Amino acid sequence: METSEDKGFCCYNYIRLKLEAIVPKDDHINALYEALKLRKHAISHINLPSFEDHQEFIKKHPYRSWNFVFAATECIGNFYLQNDNSIGVHLLPGYDHMLPVLLKQILHDYEPLPEIKSKRNAGFVLHVPVGDHERRAQMNANGHTPLQITYTLEKEQV
């Protein structure tokens, strides 16, 4: 994959990645819901939330930064940064190959928040659903090191 950096933009085959901040307006809410319906893997939910629940979530804007990702004029996904220096990336089907370019763009444009021992990593970490074997393989192939696997705990299970 040939990538280059040009004036703060990361490129793939000379197509610039551009980021657009997500705000709680109708077209953003609708686009995010359509993207949510296309996801094969999720961390925060098992069943698709109702549109109303989704809308309320967007209005709360719970992230440090939340952006759509565009290649030329086409939206290829979105990502968020949380205050614990974690990153969530959601690329639309057919755009997984853009992950390394997007991560490079994120690392170029953002600085991690300062480390807090036992609470916040010194650098960014990427959330990957345990069932997303393709994303895990992609991260491993690019030399990234897995840190942990997180389990849910239910009273009935313990």
What is each PLM-predicted segment?
Residues T145-V158:
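Conserved catalytic-core motifs of GNAT/GCN5-like acyltransferases
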Residues K117-R136, L153-E154:
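Conserved beta-strand-loop-alpha-helix junction that forms the acyl-donor binding cleft
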Residues M1-D26, V158:
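Conserved N-terminal entry element of GNAT/NAT acetyltransferase domains
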Residues E56-F68:
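A short helix-loop-beta-strand connector motif used in the catalytic cores of GNAT acetyltransferases and
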